[in-house]
Amino acid sequence: MDIQTLEIVRKANRLTNELGTNDPHKIARELGIEVIPLSFKKQRGAYKVLMRNRFIFIKDDLHPVMERIVMLHEIGHDALHREEAVKAGGFKEFNIFDMRQSRMEYEANIFASQISLPDDEILEYIENGLKVIDV
């Protein structure tokens, strides 16, 4: 694991440890990020800072599992890229599953995946004899 990825993992772990949860809606609420459901056509979510207020806009008809992933991804942008979001202005659409497209998307995905399934939880699964297919 490279230094940059390790720092993202540490930041995700610190956040969940400080807040005592990995629930994205609770995390957003604790961080003061307003979550607004929208009827996006294609885009699943977006993170935006407007006049120092932080927002996550989320597609209103996502499956709960996908909503969780997208929410954690957007929280990753808040934790890692808030300054870039302030400078960027409008919405920018990226495919969150194509990490080759953007460094920021890659980093937000690492952040989201660490909160979704932290290393210690993976180790617990392995120690209990579970396989990837079981998880």
Predicted feature residues:
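Active-site hotspot residues in diverse enzymes, especially metal/ion-binding acidic/histidine motifs
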Residues: 1-135
